[in-house]
């Protein structure tokens, strides 16, 4: 079994969250805010149901491709009072799917969710389908 960690490389088709740069960083793209490994930059959503998707790096070429699932991992926290929740998001073709609610804490913590099947047809993931899909987050 092989696990590949692939990062966002561009904003996807769903861009409802706001990138929050600090100081004079200019207009930071959402994908840059989540990929720079810096807590000073982030994305946030003021309302429930907002979606942000990202184009991720392509899978390395596989001799005998077999994808048993896609694990979406995010570093997240809540920033205001009350219950903070998000959902993992995958967009594949004209179909999308979200995970169950992920409860957030006040401190940054790694969260992950698993998409075992491609929502576009409810079929096993293929290399081509993965490379064409977008992954992200929905405010809950």
Label the model's feature ranges.
Residues 1-140:
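Disulfide-rich extracellular domains of secreted proteins
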């Amino acid at each position: 079994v092989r696990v590949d960690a692939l990062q966002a490389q561009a904003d996807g088709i769903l861009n409802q969250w706001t990138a929050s740069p600090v100081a004079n960083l200019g207009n930071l793209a959402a994908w840059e805010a989540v990929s720079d490994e810096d807590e000073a930059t982030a994305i946030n959503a003021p309302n429930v149901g907002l979606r942000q998707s990202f184009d991720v790096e392509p899978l390395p070429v596989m001799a005998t491709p077999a994808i048993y699932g896609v694990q979406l991992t995010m570093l997240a926290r809540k920033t205001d009072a009350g219950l903070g929740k998000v959902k993992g998001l995958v967009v594949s073709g004209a179909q999308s799917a979200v995970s169950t609610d992920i409860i957030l804490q006040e401190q940054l913590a790694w969260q992950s969710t698993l998409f075992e099947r491609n929502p576009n047809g409810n079929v096993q993931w293929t290399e081509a389908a993965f490379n064409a899909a977008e992954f992200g987050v929905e405010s809950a």
